[in-house]
Amino acid sequence: MVRKLGIEEELLLFDPESGEVVPAAPSVLKEFREHGPGRQRARAATDELDQELFRHQLETRTDPVRRAADALDQLVAARRTAGEAARAAGYAAGACGIVPLGGDRSVVSPNDRYRDMVDTYGEIARTGGTCGMHVHVDIGSDEEGVAVVDRIAPWLPVLVALAANSPYVEGRDSGYASWRAQVWARWPSAGPTEQFGSVAGYREVCRMLLDVGAARDPGMLYFDARLSTGQPTVEVRVCDVGTDPAVAVTIGALVRALVETAAEEWADGRPAAHWRAEALRAAHWRASRFGMADSLVHPLARGLRPARSVVAALVEAVEPALAAAGDLELVDVQLERAVNDNGATRQRAAFERTGSVRGVVDDVIARTEASWQDHDSHAGRL
């Protein structure tokens, strides 16, 4: 049976007049509860929209689904809900990996856990208001999940490059395609992991990180791929949020295919290829720095190859799983957009057109809002 997948996205809240972020999440969530779909369905706001670490952020999520088309419909619906609630409250929602221009990023959401994170981790937390996309994929057991995490690690930098959507920070070009990835890597529990080898090995590492305070709770074990807390999934956390939901679902399909392929290798008794953490970090840095604009580390050749050929190698490695899930055509059609024109490329093109990072913000907002407006005209088609 095809594994279910779910997608979480984090969005920024902007002042549409200045282009700066604003701590508007309480106002937007209030609008959603009182006047939006949350009130009409008599559902809690957290079912579709939720607060994040800072008040200039919102989180959206889909349900676990088997069909990529259903994931797209839900992802677009969640974006529409967030965007319309933001506009009704006088703001705008935008899908961007990091704050590109400025604004008030200091207001922590009213949550004891979030306040404790800032108290404990200081500047790492205070500058940690980034926006990612997380993909969840079903697993049959913790044993299978750890085997998957051990096997997919070398491929995750390819996803970093495809999803890169955060070149601008503090009104300037960072020089990176995904500056969010570098900011996120500051957390003491974040980043790629060497092989755990077993559930016991995984739990031992988790316990040590918790014991020394590198994470305050299991939800703060920010491995690039981890076993989810409270649900039987592997969660991949390496991607920037992007403006194009079809590309997001395509990346979700690739993650699902990676999980399925790795699980089959484990079930067949094939060992995981060993990678040192230093090599994985170098591959991640390369993907974050250049995105799709230069060479990437090829997980099979273990050397630099043109980014396009590394993406092709990923698709080839998981092609049977993509076909079995009915996702091969989706990937063939949509992946070309991420290869040729990912978020970082679009943001830099917007800067070239407008001559300002404010113009980049306007473009991010416009593309984010178009992502549900365009979908309405051809719903269900990928």
Swiss-Prot record:
GO terms for molecular function: ATP binding; glutamate-cysteine ligase activity. Its EC number is 6.3.2.2. ATP-dependent carboxylate-amine ligase which exhibits weak glutamate--cysteine ligase activity. Belongs to the glutamate--cysteine ligase type 2 family. YbdK subfamily. SUPFAM superfamilies: Glutamine synthetase/guanido kinase (SSF55931). InterPro entries: GCL_type2/YbdK_subfam (IPR050141), GCS2 (IPR006336), Gln_synth/guanido_kin_cat_dom (IPR014746), YbdK (IPR011793). PANTHER family: GLUTAMATE--CYSTEINE LIGASE 2-RELATED (PTHR36510:SF1). Keywords: ATP-binding, Ligase, Nucleotide-binding. This is Putative glutamate--cysteine ligase 2-1. It catalyses: L-cysteine + L-glutamate + ATP = gamma-L-glutamyl-L-cysteine + ADP + phosphate + H(+). It comes from the Bacteria. One of its GO terms (biological process) is modified amino acid biosynthetic process.
